[in-house]
């Protein structure tokens, strides 16, 4: 494979490859951080916010009240990190099966998270304290937009899992194919299961499962790109050989 990674302004093939690799690794690292950051911040709020009950209240209601800015920031930062990871994922997987739509769908997941933070839900189900005990009869415009954010995020992530199943299977990465399929099925079952009983808990569990997949995939690509059928390792090897030829014998 002779394709060469290039970065505008680089003075030599070796420098170009090194710069591109650093940027790609930084983007992949965003995926590693996104999941643990979101889960830890959300969990701390679940345990500490007065009146919040995960068995009744979805995590998006944490965006309300005096401390709502914490969850808003959590949504937005985690979403932006997921979008950054999607850019890095495309650098690693493209070209090839799933190298276009896999990253795009992961990016859609990130966009859904950002939208969920920017457009907050209306007070409901008694949270924050003093809010109506039920669901408001009429939603605000931002609550209507917010209502589309979770489906966008979950659907994008679920489809991304199955898109990458095909890639991993084609590269005989059976473990990754099985893990991606299991993640997609679990997130679909938890988020689409009929009935409102336990919905907020199911969505929270689906969020943890989905973010775990993103973080584990990002970590694996950072440590061993070839393990997931990545062409990045081949490109880096080819660029290194080119740089060595350019330096000549020592």
What does each model-found stretch correspond to?
Residues 1-27, 224-250:
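Actinobacteria-biased recognition of intrinsically disordered, low-complexity terminal regions
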Residues 19-226:
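Hydrophobic, aromatic-enriched alpha-helical segments typical of multi-pass transmembrane helices
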